[in-house]
Amino acid sequence: MTSLVSLENVSVSFGQRRVLSDVSLELSPGKILTLLGPNGAGKSTLVRVVLGLVAPDEGVIKRNGQLRIGYVPQKLYLDTTLPLTVNRFLRLRPGTQKTDILPALKRVQAGHLIDAPMQKLSGGETQRVLLARALLNRPQLLVLDEPTQGVDVNGQVALYDLIDQLRRELDCAVLMVSHDLHLVMAKTDEVLCLNHHICCSGAPEVVSMHPEFISMFGPRGAEQLGIYRHHHNHRHDLQGRIVLRRGNGHS
């Protein structure tokens, strides 16, 4: 399968501070990659590298020519005194036609919000509107920066269900950034745990294997949420230095 974006041994420094070190990944059509990591781990920098907004100091980046990217930001800041409906907000995107708006909203099951004030939307509704905005670009790559932030568990399940549906319909690659170090979308194809470098990677463990989780969130939640178990051979000290775990040597 041809990758839309591939990074090979990419490193980024800001001044004397190394933010990313030897990071490699591939984003392929129809595949979901979830990026996990603590605050300050370099997740936002890595997203900017993928988007072409930050050039690496070392390593190789390959992108499909004329790649169309849809981006959903982590937060949306709006002036609460500014009268702005969902319709007007979406039309602010350059190149958007009036006739594109309602179909995009309907695609994310948010057609009923077209005349709603942006400031009155719930967290889940806001994420759907931002997702509709990203779809206006007919993306080959969908980048979602912490899409479930501020959304309750039921909203997360519905959002993950929608993301899975969209990646199948569009056959697009999905890069999802998560602040939750353990709970991820079950249908993620690969999880990368980042702390300036890739600490570990693998597939999420499907939540259906955890009866106590199903009893808490129901069978539908079990289908859409997964637990990722980290397998690190090291830890990071307070200065960010790598310390190998016992049995793996010392540093």
Swiss-Prot record:
Cellular compartment(s): Cell inner membrane
Domain ABC transporter residues, every copy: 5-220
An example molecular function term from Gene Ontology annotations: ATP hydrolysis activity
Major enzyme class: translocase
Documented EC number(s): 7.2.2.20
Chain sites annotated for binding ATP: 37-44
SMART domains (UniProt xref): AAA
One Gene Ontology cellular component annotation held by this UniProt entry: plasma membrane
Pfam family membership, one: ABC_tran
Catalytic activity from the UniProt record: Zn(2+)(out) + ATP(in) + H2O(in) = Zn(2+)(in) + ADP(in) + phosphate(in) + H(+)(in)
Membrane topology: Peripheral membrane protein
Gene Ontology terms describing biological process: response to zinc ion
UniProtKB keywords: ATP-binding, Cell inner membrane, Cell membrane, Ion transport, Membrane, Nucleotide-binding, Translocase, Transport, Zinc, Zinc transport
UniProt-listed InterPro entries: AAA+_ATPase, ABC_transporter-like_ATP-bd, Metal_Ion_Import_ABC, P-loop_NTPase
Gene3D superfamilies cross-referenced by the UniProt entry: P-loop containing nucleotide triphosphate hydrolases
Quaternary structure annotation from Swiss-Prot or TrEMBL: The complex is composed of two ATP-binding proteins (ZnuC), two transmembrane proteins (ZnuB) and a solute-binding protein (ZnuA).
Physiological role: Part of the ABC transporter complex ZnuABC involved in zinc import. Responsible for energy coupling to the transport system.
Family membership noted in the UniProt record: Belongs to the ABC transporter superfamily. Zinc importer (TC 3.A.1.15.5) family.
Protein's name according to its UniProt entry: Zinc import ATP-binding protein ZnuC
